[in-house]
Amino acid sequence: MPENLNLCHPYCKKNTVQKWGGIGAKDTLEYYNGLTLHREFIEWNEGQGYTLIIGKKDVATARVTWQINTLSEETSELSIRIELLPDVALRRYVPWLRGLIRRFYFIPKMQHYIHNVVKGFKYYAEHETPVTKNQFGYNAMFSVK
């Protein structure tokens, strides 16, 4: 569903679609902390998930895969996998420092982020009520208190 992050994402202030549906779809995410990221969908499996690249303007900083697994007629499972492109995302840091930042800051923050985004989709599916800002906890990389 286009712009579904407006309903389900606890750190997304605004999700705007430029082009929707299939490979080549594009949208923009504006987070509560002012960060704006652009997504371009590079794989699309209707009803099963998609893969996208995300970054600032034309610079991809990560590859993200969203996958939906149907467990039963009434139950599905959402998984999100983020593959950081560290030489791009952390390029302003010297190479030896990138590994430390990735391991001790980025990965824990992103695990928290993914966990809460999945919680947002679960909440919306169960309650049909939009998720609110920081509903499942604050994340400094994407929000403000």
Where are the language model's segments positioned?
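Hydrophobic ligand-binding cavity/cleft-lining segments
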Residues: M1-G21, M141-K145
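Solvent-exposed coil/turn segments that connect beta secondary-structure elements
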Residues: Y32-G34, E46, E83-L85
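Beta-strand/loop substructures that line and gate deep hydrophobic ligand-binding cavities in soluble
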Residues: K56-N116, Y123, T132-N134
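Short, conserved beta-turn/loop elements at beta-strand boundaries and strand-helix junctions
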Residues: N45-Y50, E73
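Short, highly charged C-terminal tails/helix-capping segments
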Residues: K14, H115-K145
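Short beta-strand segments that buttress and anchor functional surface loops
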Residues: A25-Y32, Y50-K57
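Short coil-to-beta-strand transition motifs
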Residues: N33-T36, A60-T61
